[in-house]
UniProtKB/Swiss-Prot annotation:
This is P2X receptor D. One of its GO terms (molecular function) is intracellularly ATP-gated calcium channel activity. Keywords: Ion channel, Ion transport, Ligand-gated ion channel, Membrane, Receptor, Transmembrane, Transmembrane helix, Transport, Vacuole. Residues 283-296 are annotated as: Pore-forming motif. The lineage of its organism: Eukaryota, Amoebozoa, Evosea, Eumycetozoa, Dictyostelia. Belongs to the P2X receptor family. It comes from Dictyostelium discoideum (Social amoeba). Residues 1-22, 322-407 are cytoplasmic. The gene is p2xD. Residues 371-394 are annotated as: Disordered. Residues 44-300 are lumenal.
Length: 407
């Protein structure tokens, strides 16, 4: 059993092949990889930045117009003579305290467009499990002039890793129009993205940018209007400082997306004098759900190093590809393969000779060395034959001591 053969070790060998095809291809690969690492990954994709998704908070509030328009101007009101494709109802005027329900939090905001009011009494004891409220009267009305109510949106973003924090008044902002263009609004009432000013939009302007028509057909019931059933819309606020190469430039962008096949309704029970008398409100309207996202980047050496290391792996792949082309596909593949791969003879005999030489230097081990030499002489002829066979089989290969070969 030849242990040297079983536990053989493969090591890299440098061979210079003077072939313009292989050399040119390898240079092209190198140039492309360097361009990919430096130009694309590092500069264009900003591989030197550590990016994170910011978190934040949102405060939204509603304000009624200073002067309401007459309800005769609205075709959804029953005292308007203009034809309306959906159900007409009475129209009532309410202030922001009544229209904004439930009270907004940092993730959603609701605006009432229709409210059904039930005057209910309890004519029995509430301790009786079969006792139910009885409806005395019912009114179903639209909220007049809801499009002229204004909503103020104040939001703050925070990047936990880089500790970057800004309020919306400190940043430039934009809102996407119906053509997905980023626009700023600086009008008498409507303002969006102007540094130093709060973001204020009328409900009508907000719905217009979201492509939502309150007097269009509801996606839940086509016989009802959106004003009647209500609607849910997602308001995305996307923060970024990676849109340019100056990470000190920040911006945010509003985008509003209607949620299809949904309506919005919320009940409210208001106790009057006592529990036996209450007003029950069934509200329908517009629900806005705010979602803060985006990408905030800051310089990070580890991110830059990772970009370079991941790109350098491509260099090794390019070398493997050129090697495989040389030893498997080119007409000279056998010649190239013979120079690339070299098998050495076993080194057991060399180690034995070295051990004998060291033992001969020690007089105390001379007798044992002589015995070992006699035993080894019995195998000399066999080893010589082995070496001759090895030399024949490796015709075309270089000696292992020639580590650098130039063709």
């Amino acid at each position: 059993m030849d242990w040297d053969n079983i536990f053989s070790y493969n090591t890299a060998k440098i061979v210079t092949i003077k072939d313009r095809r292989l050399g040119g291809l390898h240079i092209i690969f190198m140039v492309l990889i360097i361009v990919y690492i430096v130009i694309y990954s590092t500069i264009y994709k900003k591989g030197y930045l550590l990016t994170e998704t910011p978190v934040g908070s949102i405060r939204a509030s509603l304000l009624a117009p200073n002067e309401f328009k007459d309800d005769s101007n609205f075709k959804y009101c029953d005292d308007n003579l203009i034809e309306y494709n959906f159900t007409k109802l009475e129209c009532d005027y309410y202030d922001e305290a009544f229209v904004s329900f439930p009270v907004g939090d940092d993730v959603s905001f609701a605006v009432t467009t229709r409210v059904k009011t039930l005057d209910q009494v309890l004519n029995c004891s509430s301790k009786n499990p079969k006792c139910k409220y009885t409806t005395v009267s019912t009114r179903n009305v639209y909220v007049s002039d809801i499009e002229d109510f204004t909503i103020l949106i104040d939001h703050t973003m925070f990047a936990p890793s880089s500790l970057i924090q800004y309020n919306s008044k400190q940043l430039k902002g934009y809102i996407l129009d119906n053509d997905n263009n980023e626009i700023q609004i600086n009008e008498t009432i409507n303002t969006v993205g102007i540094p130093g000013k709060p973001d204020i939009l009328t409900i009508g302007k907000l719905l217009q940018l979201a492509n939502i028509d309150l007097d269009g057909a509801s996606s839940v019931n086509s016989t009802n209007s959106v004003r009647y059933d209500g609607v849910v819309a997602l308001v995305f606020i996307t923060y970024s400082n990676t849109f340019s190469y100056n990470t000190n430039n920040f911006k945010y962008v509003y985008s509003i997306q209607k949620v299809e096949d949904t309506e919005y309704g919320v009940p409210e029970a208001v106790i009057l004098d006592n529990v036996s008398s209450r007003m029950y409100y069934n509200r329908h309207g517009i629900r806005l759900i705010f979602i803060q996202n985006g990408e905030i980047g800051s310089f990070n050496f580890q991110a830059l190093l990772l970009t370079f290391v991941s790109g350098l792996g491509l260099l090794a792949i390019s070398t493997v590809l050129v090697d495989q082309l040389a030893i498997r596909f080119l007409p000279e593949r056998k010649t190239y393969s013979s120079h690339k791969f070299q098998i050495t003879h076993g080194f057991s005999e060399s180690r034995n000779k070295l051990r004998i030489s060291q033992n001969e230097k020690d007089p105390l081990l001379l007798v044992e060395t002589t015995k070992n030499n006699e035993n080894n002489n019995n195998n000399d002829d066999y080893n010589d034959d082995d070496n001759e066979i090895f030399d024949d089989n490796n015709n075309g290969y270089q000696n292992i001591q020639n580590n650098n070969i130039i063709l």
